[in-house]
């Protein structure tokens, strides 16, 4: 982060203390800040529903599972949109944008597809029927569709799946052509994880975009899932460099499934600070690249995160805790968005297809930021003893260290000093 990007310091003066993430993101030049929706929680958890439906906080929704193949066509030719409609209906009711996810993916694929005895003609017919029906059902509602998901494995090779075995890489342009025919007006994305590290997997994803383009098929965007680890997230500059590898090909980019998990729990106060800085670097990199259109977190509360089920002993990867309190990560994101709001970057030429009013006029009181638990002083009748408190967490260079509403660290790592920029924002300089 450059000093000058923070020192544009009408900063939060242009964004009052009540400003929320989507509102700030739009002011900063992005199209949206959004969240995934956990279908099973929306009707059973009122607090979850209230925050998710706050259009100043989240301007876009994406279904976590409801539009995947196993949900929409569990048996051949038998379509069920009940789960996918939960998110689509909620977005429409609230006036939020909708990202749609996903069409061609090796996982959550019914056995009748993955184990079928196909040739090119028969599998293409299956793909066409699926894409026509699913995209047809949501036609006109989706800003973008993740057409192909995770086609590259962790070693940077083409992922072995039924589509690759039958078509080779021809299934990639085929998928995008079928999607374009089904809904000509939505944006068509390739979506994957670990592209952020700019290694062999990223190289292969660049090749994928070129394969689709060279075949004359349409591809509009690349989604960076952003499933990252606290302390191992690339820097803001490194992330922006990777984003530009794709925008230079003429496609837009977005962070589509962002979460940053702690590898050890419970997280220390210092780890929470690091997590906040990592989130700020991701969001900041999107602000730094004109072709980056938005950020979506993969659910917003630790209560409904997929991480603990997949990575044992890890988690707390989101911006609200399990009790719906805003974490330091939320504050870090809001700060980096507010810093850019007075001097937003150039935006790309298209807009999210959402109603003109993108956030509500009525406001709700956000849940309080939880206070850190400090061990209490204990004594005995014989010999007084004191439990030593953990060291005060320290903010890194460029990080926020104070201001109205700030509940994070107020001490900077040496040799940096906590410097007042305005009443709302103090920074380690």
From Swiss-Prot:
<comment type="pathway">
    <text>Glycan degradation; xylan degradation.</text>
</comment>
<feature type="signal peptide">
    <location>
        <begin position="1"/>
        <end position="19"/>
    </location>
</feature>
<keyword id="KW-0732">Signal</keyword>
<dbReference type="InterPro" id="IPR000254">
    <property type="entry name" value="Cellulose-bd_dom_fun"/>
</dbReference>
<dbReference type="GO" id="GO:0045493">
    <property type="term" value="P:xylan catabolic process"/>
</dbReference>
<comment type="function">
    <text>Endo-1,4-beta-xylanase involved in the hydrolysis of xylan, a major structural heterogeneous polysaccharide found in plant biomass representing the second most abundant polysaccharide in the biosphere, after cellulose.</text>
</comment>
<protein>
    <recommendedName>
        <fullName>Endo-1,4-beta-xylanase 1</fullName>
        <ecNumber>3.2.1.8</ecNumber>
    </recommendedName>
</protein>
<feature type="region of interest" description="Disordered">
    <location>
        <begin position="364"/>
        <end position="395"/>
    </location>
</feature>
<feature type="compositionally biased region" description="Low complexity">
    <location>
        <begin position="371"/>
        <end position="389"/>
    </location>
</feature>
<dbReference type="Pfam" id="PF00331">
    <property type="entry name" value="Glyco_hydro_10"/>
</dbReference>
<dbReference type="InterPro" id="IPR035971">
    <property type="entry name" value="CBD_sf"/>
</dbReference>
<dbReference type="GO" id="GO:0005576">
    <property type="term" value="C:extracellular region"/>
</dbReference>
<feature type="active site" description="Proton donor">
    <location>
        <position position="150"/>
    </location>
</feature>
<dbReference type="InterPro" id="IPR017853">
    <property type="entry name" value="Glycoside_hydrolase_SF"/>
</dbReference>
<keyword id="KW-1015">Disulfide bond</keyword>
<keyword id="KW-0858">Xylan degradation</keyword>
<dbReference type="GO" id="GO:0030248">
    <property type="term" value="F:cellulose binding"/>
</dbReference>
<dbReference type="Pfam" id="PF00734">
    <property type="entry name" value="CBM_1"/>
</dbReference>
<comment type="similarity">
    <text>Belongs to the glycosyl hydrolase 10 (cellulase F) family.</text>
</comment>
<keyword id="KW-0326">Glycosidase</keyword>
<feature type="domain" description="GH10">
    <location>
        <begin position="43"/>
        <end position="336"/>
    </location>
</feature>
<keyword id="KW-0624">Polysaccharide degradation</keyword>
<feature type="disulfide bond">
    <location>
        <begin position="286"/>
        <end position="292"/>
    </location>
</feature>
<keyword id="KW-0964">Secreted</keyword>
<dbReference type="InterPro" id="IPR001000">
    <property type="entry name" value="GH10_dom"/>
</dbReference>
<keyword id="KW-0119">Carbohydrate metabolism</keyword>
<keyword id="KW-0378">Hydrolase</keyword>
<dbReference type="GO" id="GO:0031176">
    <property type="term" value="F:endo-1,4-beta-xylanase activity"/>
</dbReference>
<dbReference type="InterPro" id="IPR044846">
    <property type="entry name" value="GH10"/>
</dbReference>
<feature type="active site" description="Nucleophile">
    <location>
        <position position="257"/>
    </location>
</feature>
<feature type="domain" description="CBM1">
    <location>
        <begin position="393"/>
        <end position="429"/>
    </location>
</feature>
């Amino acid at each position: 982060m450059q000093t000058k990007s923070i020192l544009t310091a009408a900063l939060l003066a242009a964004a009052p203390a009540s400003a929320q993430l989507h509102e700030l993101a739009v002011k900063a030049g992005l199209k949206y800040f959004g969240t995934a929706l956990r279908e099973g929680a929306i009707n059973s958890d009122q607090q979850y529903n209230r925050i998710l439906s706050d259009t100043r906080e989240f301007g876009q929704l994406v279904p976590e599972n409801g539009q995947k193949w196993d949900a929409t066509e569990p048996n051949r030719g038998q379509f069920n949109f009940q789960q996918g409609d939960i998110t689509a209906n909620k977005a429409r009711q609230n006036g939020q944008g909708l990202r749609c996810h996903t069409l061609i993916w090796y996982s959550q694929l019914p056995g009748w597809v993955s184990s079928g005895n196909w040739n090119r003609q028969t599998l293409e017919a299956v793909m066409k029927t699926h894409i026509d029906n699913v995209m047809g059902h949501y036609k006109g509602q989706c800003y973008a569709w993740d057409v192909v998901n995770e086609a590259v494995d962790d070693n940077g090779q083409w992922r072995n799946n039924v589509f690759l075995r039958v078509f080779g890489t021809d299934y990639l342009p085929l998928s995008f052509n079928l999607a374009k025919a089904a809904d000509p007006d939505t944006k068509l994305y390739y979506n994957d994880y670990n592209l952020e590290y700019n290694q062999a997997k990223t190289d292969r994803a660049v090749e994928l975009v070129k394969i689709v383009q060279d075949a004359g098929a349409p591809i509009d965007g690349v989604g960076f899932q952003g499933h990252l680890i606290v302390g191992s997230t690339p820097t803001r500059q490194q992330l922006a460099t990777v984003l530009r590898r794709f925008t230079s090909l003429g496609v837009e980019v977005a962070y589509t499934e962002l979460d940053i998990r702690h590898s050890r729990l419970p997280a220390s106060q210092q780890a929470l600070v690091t997590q906040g800085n990592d989130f700020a670097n991701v969001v900041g990199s999107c602000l730094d690249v004109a072709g980056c259109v938005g950020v979506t977190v993969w659910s917003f509360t630790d209560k409904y995160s997929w991480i603990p089920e997949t990575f044992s002993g890890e988690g707390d990867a989101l911006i609200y805790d399990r009790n719906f309190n805003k974490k330091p990560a939320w504050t870090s994101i809001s700060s980096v968005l507010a810093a850019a709001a007075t001097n937003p970057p150039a935006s790309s030429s298209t807009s999210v297809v959402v109603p003109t009013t993108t956030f509500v006029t009525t406001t709700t009181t956000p849940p309080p930021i939880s206070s850190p638990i400090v061990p209490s002083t204990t004594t005995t009748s014989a010999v007084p003893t004191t439990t030593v408190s953990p060291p005060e967490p320290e903010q890194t260079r460029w990080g926020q260290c104070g201001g109205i509403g700030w509940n994070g660290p107020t001490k900077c790592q040496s040799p940096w000093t906590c410097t007042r920029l305005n009443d709302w924002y103090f920074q380690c300089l």
